[in-house]
Amino acid sequence: MQNAIAAVGGVLALLLGLAWPAAGWATEGALGRQITGTNVQPNAGIVSPEPIWAVNFAEIYMDGSIGGSREVPIGGRTSLGLDAKVAFTLATVLKTWDTGPGRWNFASSFTLPYVWTKVNSTVTGPGGRSVGQSDTASNLFDLYFSPIIAGYHFSETSHMALSFNVWAPTGKYNANDMANPSLNNWTFIPQVAYTKIFPESGFQLDTVAGIQFYTRNNATDYRNAPLFSMDVMGRKMFSNGVSAGLILGTIQQLGNDSGPTADRLNGFKGRDWALGPIVTYDRKLADKRSLSLGLRWVPTISSTNRLDSSSTVMATATLVF
């Protein structure tokens, strides 16, 4: 069970490729499916060699903006700048399958997300005047599932996990609204995670990288270009179950968005970087169960055509049994 405990963050790292509601977002609405710095989890590359169930609850809050000098694609039109607040709650269930001893282990997962979002924008009204608008949405978000998560153990201190993750457009969407509890597209994310443990120093390195492929939003005729994302986390573990470290993350757009609005904005290509601290706590419970808690703050340190946030906070709680 000790190995199962260590693997909790690993499989959940593959589950929490977090998506965000459309204020349309480089990328329609200026965000996309993942928030920089929130994807990597402790033990990211480890899939448990023991059959387990894991239940995870995650809460993320973000308050971001793009300056008013930039046009942002949103809901089939453009806004001069954008301010968005998002509170995201995710409940995830994961099953690691009993595949017996060996270097490979496998898991599957399902996530039910709920979102609250408020968007403020400035659009061009009649006569060319700028008009401020505000919109709020609160509902179930697009469903997220990982049909296959494959973990490979190079050694007791070196692990890798491969996954194929899917966001389905199950949330409500209205192209006339600025805030929507859906991106109104399918998103496919192949992802690789790696964990390296240094037992002598109590240091651990975790990294997660993936590429997001989007289908077209047929309601706005907008298609996001593929996005490359990578988060790296280094932590120092202590004997009392507490760890502390830093996270560095980036999202880089690999091409231009397409569609009439994107073409007018020259593809609206974007990128960003985030850097911030993380604190975690792991505790063994009775009957081979375990509890893992985490709290991070990952503010944006550089951003182009993506929401810039100094208030991105994520809290997680995971029970393994």
Describe each model-derived feature in a short phrase.
Residues 28-34, 61-88, 123-135, 178:
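Surface-exposed strand-loop-strand hairpins of Gram-negative outer-membrane beta-barrel proteins
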